[in-house]
Amino acid sequence: MAGKTLYDKLWEMHEVKRRDDGSSLIYIDRHILHEVTSPQAFEGLRLANRKPWRIDANIATPDHNVPTTKGERQGGLEAIADEVSRIQVQTLDENCDDFGILEFKMNDVRQGIVHVIGPEQGATLPGMTVVCGDSHTSTHGAFGALAHGIGTSEVEHVLATQCLVAKKMKNMQVRVEGKLPFGVTAKDIVLAVIGKIGTAGGNGHALEFAGSAIRDLSMEGRMTICNMAIEAGARVGMVAVDEKTIAYVEGRPYAPKGADWDKAVKLWQDLVSDDDAVFDTIVELKAEDIKPQVSWGTSPEMVLAVDQNVPDPAVEADPVKKDSITRALKYMGLQANQAITDIRLDRVFIGSCTNSRIEDLRAAAEVAKGRKVAANVKQALVVPGSGLVKQQAEAEGLDKIFIEAGFEWREPGCSMCLAMNPDKLGSGEHCASTSNRNFEGRQGAGGRTHLVSPAMAAAAAVTGHFIDVRELIQA
């Protein structure tokens, strides 16, 4: 009998009942809530006269709509200019108060992006099932957890029953072997993976990232990779538990303590795929072949190494691909065969649930130190992923480095990742962004998004165009 994958093990641990139609009832250990996808779910509970099944399994924070300037934050709810945004944040506060759910409110130092605060607080643990009304919940899979996004109706279902109906996915292993070259990061790995398999490559699969290059990554790097499993077409991304996982979790506020900790660690050590586990699909990359990546088009799969040129639709034989390239070039305001390094930037955004943790900010600060934001860059934002990340960065003096270089140092939130708060692109503006999606209008109507790592974003900010960051930093 073949061994089990990590996904197989997590599924079996949480399968309450197998149904006749092939789906299963799955128990949910952790439910994370934010202001955008939860209001209707709470209203559904009220209308049905229900209460949350397990209050302590839920944790909440506002992130999508919150303003990130200090002045607006200090003004509290009334300072949120957009009425819908203000109502959503206020409604989350009221719902959590009414139902007794732990919430880190807008000006709590523990507030932040949902996928930053869960791991940071130890609310995300190995072996858990974790859900949230947000597609990038796959981030939490970095801890050897089964984590995925859910819709608003499912948010209500989890609140009411602590279970979900789901169908088991296929298994895909993405193996990245070897040592990453200097200056190449987790963000570059996952962009290279998406460039290789496409945004539909992981459809119907749970992705397990493995190999020596993945094991060498920090937990923060692993979170970046799992975060963008969704852009590879998968609902789930995960990394097996090892000593780095356990070291990261130990001592965090909601992690087990004492004898419970010892017991948990013993259980977590089995959260790896067996040596003889069978995967439906295996994708392999050599770490040494990966260079700093830059997305050029309107899909995350439209990505190239920084030393390449954007494609020419005239030489594309596939009519569908040809049309896609032509449309993307037009929207992005680029010319066929244009060098990536010739793309000039109007704005730079360092933040999001993909890249707003302390290691991300350190990497960007290393590039920014002693330099100035280029004259053609109208705005360069640095938005920490949580109040605690911000606090730590300030203790290390990173805020001063950014401010002296001409960056804006902001309060935590989703910010310019998506156009749901005051931080937006103007039409036609090019932005080097450490976020996860570059769809048309994602950062603002007509905005042109280029996905990069934090170091590459900082390099673009200080030079005004894309450049291989390795030209600016020392090995």
From Swiss-Prot:
InterPro entries listed in its UniProt record: 3-IsopropMal_deHydase_lsu, Acnase/IPM_dHydase_lsu_aba_1/3, Acoase/IPM_deHydtase_lsu_aba, Aconitase_4Fe-4S_BS, Aconitase_4Fe-4S_dom, IPM_dehydratase_rel_enz, IPMI_cat
Matches recorded under Pfam families: Aconitase
Keywords of the record: 4Fe-4S, Amino-acid biosynthesis, Branched-chain amino acid biosynthesis, Iron, Iron-sulfur, Leucine biosynthesis, Lyase, Metal-binding
The keyword Amino-acid biosynthesis is annotated on this UniProt entry: yes
UniProt pathway annotation: Amino-acid biosynthesis; L-leucine biosynthesis; L-leucine from 3-methyl-2-oxobutanoate: step 2/4
Catalytically driven reaction(s): (2R,3S)-3-isopropylmalate = (2S)-2-isopropylmalate
Cofactor note: Binds 1 [4Fe-4S] cluster per subunit.
Entry binding sites for [4Fe-4S] cluster: 353, 414, 417
Protein name: 3-isopropylmalate dehydratase large subunit
Taxon lineage: Bacteria, Pseudomonadati, Pseudomonadota, Gammaproteobacteria, Pseudomonadales
Gene: leuC
